[in-house]
C-alpha cells in the first residue's frame, strides 16, 4: 500500500529533435510516391521532467544548455519548490547519470534530507523509470509524422502538451503507474 505521507516522483532528461520521425501513416491510394517533408537538421530541445506518480502531475523545465550538474541542481531546486506545498516527504526516482551524483549539489541534498531524497535506479536500466513511457507518448502525440520548419515549432508542440499535464492527469498517472 502506498504511504500517504510520501510523494514519489520519477525524473529524467529528454531531447526532442526537429527532424521528425515517420511512423505508420495513411496515404491516399492515388498517391503512389508521396513526398514527406522533413527538415535536414539534428537540432533538438532538451527538457528535465518529473512526474508525480500519485496523480500524474508533470513538472518540466526546458534546458537551453547541456545537461550537467549545474542544470540538474537548478531543476532539483525547482522540483523541491513545486513539491513543497504538499507537506509530504518527496522521493525522486532518477537514473545514474554522472551529474546526478555530483559533489556540486551533494551538500544541498543532505540539507534537504529526509524530506527530499533521490533514489537511484540500478545502472543501465532506463526501462524501470516510469517517465520514459511519458517521453514515448509525447513523441507519438506531438512529433510523429509531422513537419517542423523551426525548432520553436517543436517547442510549441511539446510544451502545449506538457501544459495539459502540469495539474495532474489520469492518463499520465495510469501510464506511469508502478504495479
Each model region followed by its residue ranges:
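Short, basic/hydrophobic alpha-helical segments
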Residues: 71-91
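RNase H-like two-metal-ion nuclease catalytic core shared by retroviral integrases
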Residues: 94-96, 103, 119-141, 151-154
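Acidic beta-strand-to-loop metal/phosphate-binding motif
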Residues: 10, 89-95
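Extended, low-complexity cationic-aromatic segments
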Residues: 1-77
Amino acid at each position: 500500500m502506498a504511504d500517504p505521507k510520501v510523494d514519489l516522483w520519477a525524473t529524467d532528461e529528454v531531447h526532442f529533435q526537429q527532424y521528425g520521425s515517420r511512423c505508420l501513416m495513411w496515404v491516399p491510394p492515388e498517391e503512389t510516391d508521396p513526398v514527406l517533408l522533413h527538415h535536414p537538421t539534428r537540432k533538438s530541445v532538451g527538457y528535465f521532467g518529473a512526474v508525480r506518480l500519485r496523480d500524474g502531475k508533470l513538472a518540466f523545465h526546458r534546458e537551453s544548455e547541456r545537461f550537467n550538474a549545474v542544470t540538474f541542481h537548478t531543476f532539483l531546486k525547482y522540483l523541491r519548490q513545486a513539491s513543497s506545498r504538499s507537506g509530504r516527504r518527496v522521493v525522486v526516482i532518477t537514473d545514474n547519470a554522472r551529474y546526478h551524483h555530483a559533489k556540486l549539489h551533494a551538500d544541498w541534498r543532505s540539507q534537504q534530507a529526509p524530506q527530499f531524497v533521490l533514489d537511484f535506479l540500478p545502472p543501465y536500466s532506463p526501462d524501470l523509470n516510469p517517465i520514459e513511457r511519458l517521453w514515448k507518448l509525447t513523441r507519438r502525440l506531438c512529433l510523429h509524422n509531422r513537419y517542423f520548419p523551426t525548432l520553436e515549432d517543436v517547442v510549441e508542440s511539446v510544451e502545449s502538451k506538457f501544459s495539459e499535464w502540469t495539474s495532474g492527469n489520469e492518463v499520465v498517472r495510469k501510464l506511469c503507474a508502478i504495479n
